[in-house]
Curated annotation (Swiss-Prot):
One annotated GO molecular function: RNA binding
Native source species: Bos taurus (Bovine)
Alphabetical list of InterPro entries matching this protein: KOW, Rib_uL2_dom2, Ribosomal_uL24, Ribosomal_uL24_CS, Ribosomal_uL24_KOW, Translation_prot_SH3-like_sf
Family: Belongs to the universal ribosomal protein uL24 family.
Transit peptide location: 1-9
KOW domain ranges (all copies): 56-89
Cellular localisation: Mitochondrion
Biological process according to GO: translation
Protein name in the entry: Large ribosomal subunit protein uL24m
A GO CC term assigned to this protein in UniProt: mitochondrion
One Pfam family hit: KOW
Keyword terms of this UniProt record: Mitochondrion, Phosphoprotein, Ribonucleoprotein, Ribosomal protein, Transit peptide
Length: 216
């Protein structure tokens, strides 16, 4: 575990029990506008899918089955697991205005709308056609996705994290903090204040005495 991952655990957002997940990251400014404090939104029914059965990930090549872009293929750029949503890059878009003011109508920009997991299918790398998949184990014991039509393994893509690092391919450099150094306990709690610890470490002797203070 890297130091950035340890710091991310400390800044984890605590969500209320009736929180409704959306396209924005929980705790962000856009999310707070959708879920203002003190309000209760109607609960959304979501099909329960076990974590071990979920098979769509960021970077996957999928084909859309429904909607205006049915038959088109694209790359998954976002997965909202709590709503069974996936977002396909450049497809299933709608247009909206941003930066609207009194004197300016705003700039029209495209925005990808989410799709349910059953509205897309993974693309088989053998023939570039949509296919059903199932989880199987290889001879080495690795759990992989396999096309039910061709039997071809569909590997999981390596997707960078928010800080741009791909954990599977990252190699620590000379300026990176190792896991052992990050987890090493170097602080020993004491009853002295910080100032007293610094004075003791640097050999500073306090010879001054408090003078009388008069208030008028």
């Amino acid at each position: 575990m890297r130091l950035s991952a340890l710091l991310a655990l400390a800044s984890k957002v605590t969500l209320p029990p009736n929180y409704r997940y959306g396209m924005s990251r929980p705790g962000s400014l856009a999310d707070k506008k959708k879920n203002p404090p003190g309000t209760r939104r109607r609960r959304v029914a979501v099909e329960p899918i076990p974590e071990e059965d979920w098979h769509l990930f960021c970077g996957d090549r999928v084909e859309i089955l429904e909607g205006k872009d049915a038959g088109k293929q694209g790359k998954v750029v976002q997965v909202i697991r709590q709503r069974n949503w996936v977002v396909v890059e450049g497809l299933n878009t709608h247009y909206r205005y941003v930066g609207k003011t009194v004197d300016f109508r705003g700039t029209m920009v495209p925005s990808e709308a989410p799709l349910l997991h059953n509205q897309v299918k993974l693309v088989d790398p053998m023939d570039r056609k949509p296919t059903e998949v199932e989880w199987r184990f290889t001879e080495a014991g690795e759990r992989v996705r396999v096309s039910t039509r061709s039997g071809r393994i569909i590997p999981k893509p390596d997707v960078p994290r928010a800080d741009g690092i791909v954990p599977e391919t990252w190699i620590d450099g000379p300026k990176d903090t190792s896991v052992e150094d990050a987890l090493e306990k170097t602080y020993v709690p004491r009853l002295k204040t910080l100032e007293e610890e610094v004075m003791e470490a640097m050999g500073i002797q306090e010879t001054r005495r408090h003078k009388k203070v008069y208030w008028y």
